[in-house]
Amino acid sequence: MFPAQEEADRTVFVGNLEARVREEILYELFLQAGPLTKVTLCKDRDGKPKSFGFVCFKHPESVSYAIALLNGIRLYGRPINVQYRFGSSRSSEPANQSFESCAKINSHSFRNDEMAGRPSFPVPFFPITSAALPQEYFFFQKMPWYAHSPVLQPPFCEMPAPLPNSVPGSCALNHSPGPEAGPSSYEWTHQPPSDPDLYPRNKRKRQRPDSDSDSSSEDKRGNEGSQKCRKCKKKKRY
């Protein structure tokens, strides 16, 4: 077999590509089907990428598997078209028969899986890389309303339960439905303690300054009286 024919049998045609698709994205995507040797994204005379390209595998068996695995998946919202390359020995084969041919090629490995007790058709694993994801995905992740949207959370906002009234000096949230404050405004209010034993103590504490003032006034009166007595004694002496 000629080298050109051999390379054509190891290459797939990838069409209907979006303008933002790069060769690195195609490499990460088609690497799931097998090892690659070359990824080419066709460009026009101005250097702008066209809507198709070619992916060359290391083994020809990977071509049928890549068509069965990746044909029709969406890149940037557009389904890609994966076919045999024109000029290959299997280019006339319809795309819907690629899965059957892939099953025939890998029938030996499937039989070994059945002997080992594993399922005959293993589920392929699709690793998601940052290069294969559109930029809009990361843009919406960074938006604050994306992670804290009230629609995604429980009904509106669940406020924390207020502290029990038995705790002295506790505070609670009261809803104020005023037109200026808005329908969802809250204000802090101080709740007096419900323990009746605390009030006499406060009264006693308040009475202490009064008694002190009374004693000070009595002392003043006593001083004034003593001064008057001294004046009277002086007058009697004279």
Curated annotation (Swiss-Prot):
InterPro entries (UniProt xref): NEXT_complex_subunit (IPR052285), Nucleotide-bd_a/b_plait_sf (IPR012677), RBD_domain_sf (IPR035979), RBM11_RRM (IPR034501), RRM_dom (IPR000504)
GO molecular function terms listed in the Swiss-Prot or TrEMBL record: poly(U) RNA binding; protein homodimerization activity
Record keyword Chloroplast present: no
Domain RRM, residue spans: 10-87
Tissue: Selectively expressed in brain, cerebellum and testis, and to a lower extent in kidney.
Cellular compartments per GO CC: nuclear speck; nucleoplasm; nucleus
UniProtKB keywords: Developmental protein, Differentiation, mRNA processing, mRNA splicing, Nucleus, RNA-binding
Motif Bipartite nuclear localization signal, residue numbers: 202-237
The keyword RNA-binding is annotated on this UniProt entry: yes
Chief location: nucleus
Stored PROSITE patterns: RRM
One family name in Pfam for this protein: RRM_1
Transmembrane domains' residue ranges: none
Region listing for Disordered, in residue ranges: 172-238
SMART domains given in the database record: RRM
GO annotation terms (biological process): cell differentiation; cellular response to oxidative stress; mRNA processing; regulation of alternative mRNA splicing, via spliceosome; RNA splicing
Subcellular location(s) per record: Nucleus, Nucleoplasm; Nucleus speckle
Biased composition (Basic residues): 228-238
Entry function: Tissue-specific splicing factor with potential implication in the regulation of alternative splicing during neuron and germ cell differentiation. Antagonizes SRSF1-mediated BCL-X splicing. May affect the choice of alternative 5' splice sites by binding to specific sequences in exons and antagonizing the SR protein SRSF1.
Known partners and oligomeric status: Homodimer.
Protein name per Swiss-Prot or TrEMBL: Splicing regulator RBM11
Organism: Mus musculus
Gene name for this UniProt entry: Rbm11
